[in-house]
Amino acid sequence: MARSHGERLKTRHKFNKDLRARGLSPVSKAVQEFEVGQKVHIDIDPSVHKGMPYRRFQGLTGEILGQAGRAWFVGISDGGKKKTVIARSQHLKPQKNSA
């Protein structure tokens, strides 16, 4: 049988939740708002399939560039090249201030 090359290929451990975090996400993650220029971490929530960024961007930190509907544009640097990732707010976590 031919091997599949789907979006979630090689994500068996990367998209695992710890035992206490299993199940659906809280609604507060779905309705969180960001400001343009705010720093966010891409933290993919595997229980929400809509608006999920590609697995390569898991764990990266970027800057909010704008919004389109329920999704956010996040500017990241991938190997020195600027890229724009489109993700819903369930897959984004605001960066805490280092002050």
UniProtKB/Swiss-Prot annotation:
InterPro entries, per database record: Ribosomal_eL21 (IPR001147), Ribosomal_eL21_arc (IPR022856), Ribosomal_eL21_CS (IPR018259), Ribosomal_eL21_sf (IPR036948), Translation_prot_SH3-like_sf (IPR008991)
Recorded family membership: Belongs to the eukaryotic ribosomal protein eL21 family.
Source species, domain of life: Archaea
Alphabetical UniProt keywords: Ribonucleoprotein, Ribosomal protein
GO cellular component: ribonucleoprotein complex; ribosome
Name of this chain's protein: Large ribosomal subunit protein eL21
GO molecular function, one term: structural constituent of ribosome
GO biological process: translation
